[in-house]
């Protein structure tokens, strides 16, 4: 792939346009959350006003179990989007992931793009997670990655594994050989918690087994399953590259979010776990947490509000959180721990 910051910036803008204007959801593939029912308790003994949504992730307190998912950075429009997202996160006491910071690794023109990730001024207290691609995470790149994280004031690093997206992208990084070893080495060298994530095609049992076979065991501090059922980045990249779907079967390939949550939680009972990929409602969040996730992440539904204003983002998220609170109340869970204890019922 080209390392030209101008080309990266142009592609980022095309990503935004396609996600706003085209149908980029999976077709015929769902999150799988509809196959579970949150038990309804007609005799709940909770008070809606007293429901406690507070959570903790990577040692940071959150007023609700929500992260704003990784979206953008490097395009001219990205700065406004990220500042509006970060402002809403600060107001609501939730976390935020930045979009890929690859463009910041360039020594020259890439530095101009760094301003699109600069959100600490409006979000001084937010759990802020930086972002780099697994394909770019070489040992030689670690000092530049660390510098990029320091520059934005990040608390942690998300490393996105996106082999299918890269395969669909013009000039994409398609050599992932040795990437597990590089991930282990980078995690050892970086003084930040590392969150391994997909981009919407899912992390499941097979990937976790590969991680656990590495010398020293699991090299990361947490997993974001980023499952199938929401935005398909294989679909996005095909639309950006060709203006149409050349490979429709590849546009709808992935591990559904619910399946990914269950598989990863079974393999890693105590590791911080993010549920993302098609999380659209408070009920989706409640089911995901009941299945074992610690927090959920939401991305594309916030893109259009973020172009409008921070208040529009806040309003969207407040409705989401209000629904989540009612879900806990009406299943008799005063807090998130109780929600996990109650669990969900599989629909046969």
Curated annotation (Swiss-Prot):
Keywords linked to the UniProt accession: Cytoplasm, Flavoprotein, FMN, Isomerase, Isoprene biosynthesis, Magnesium, Metal-binding, NADP
Cofactor(s) required for function per UniProt: FMN; NADPH; Mg(2+)
Binding of Mg(2+), residues: 166
Top EC class of this enzyme: isomerase
Enzyme Commission numbers on file: 5.3.3.2
Residues where substrate binds: 11-12, 100-102, 165
Job of this protein: Involved in the biosynthesis of isoprenoids. Catalyzes the 1,3-allylic rearrangement of the homoallylic substrate isopentenyl (IPP) to its allylic isomer, dimethylallyl diphosphate (DMAPP).
Name recorded for this polypeptide: Isopentenyl-diphosphate delta-isomerase
Lineage: Bacteria, Bacillati, Actinomycetota, Actinomycetes, Mycobacteriales
């Amino acid at each position: 792939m080209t390392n030209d910051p101008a080309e990266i910036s142009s592609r980022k803008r095309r990503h935004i346009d396609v996600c706003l204007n085209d149908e980029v959801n999976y077709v015929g593939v769902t999150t799988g959350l509809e196959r579970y029912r949150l038990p309804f308790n007609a005799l709940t003994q909770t008070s809606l006003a007293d429901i406690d949504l507070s959570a903790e992730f990577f040692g940071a307190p959150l007023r609700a179990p929500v992260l704003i998912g990784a979206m953008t950075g490097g395009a001219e429009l990205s700065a406004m989007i990220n500042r509006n997202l970060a402002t809403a996160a600060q107001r609501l006491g939730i976390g935020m992931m930045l979009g890929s910071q690859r463009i910041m690794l360039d020594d020259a023109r890439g530095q101009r793009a760094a301003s699109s990730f600069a959100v600490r001024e409006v979000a001084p207290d937010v759990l802020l997670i930086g972002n780099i691609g697994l394909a770019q995470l070489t040992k030689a790149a670690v000092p530049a990655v660390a510098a990029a994280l320091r520059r934005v004031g990040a608390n942690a690093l998300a490393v996105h594994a996106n082999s299918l997206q890269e395969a669909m992208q013009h000039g994409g990084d398609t050599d992932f050989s040795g990437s597990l070893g590089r991930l282990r080495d980078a995690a050892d060298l970086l003084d930040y918690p590392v969150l391994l994530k997909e981009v919407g095609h899912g992390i499941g049992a097979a990937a976790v087994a590969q991680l656990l076979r590495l010398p020293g065991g699991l090299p990361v501090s947490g997993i974001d399953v980023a499952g199938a059922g929401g935005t398909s980045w294989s679909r996005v990249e095909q639309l950006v590259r060709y203006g149409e779907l050349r490979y429709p079967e590849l546009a709808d390939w992935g591990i559904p979010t619910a399946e990914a949550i269950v598989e990863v939680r079974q393999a890693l009972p105590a590791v911080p776990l993010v549920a993302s990929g098609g999380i659209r409602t408070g009920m989706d969040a409640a089911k995901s947490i009941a299945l074992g996730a610690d927090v959920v992440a939401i991305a594309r539904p916030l893109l259009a509000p973020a172009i409008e204003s921070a208040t529009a983002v806040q309003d969207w998220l407040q409705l989401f959180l209000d629904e989540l609170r009612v879900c806990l109340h009406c299943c008799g869970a005063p807090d998130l721990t109780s929600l996990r204890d109650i669990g969900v019922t599989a629909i046969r």
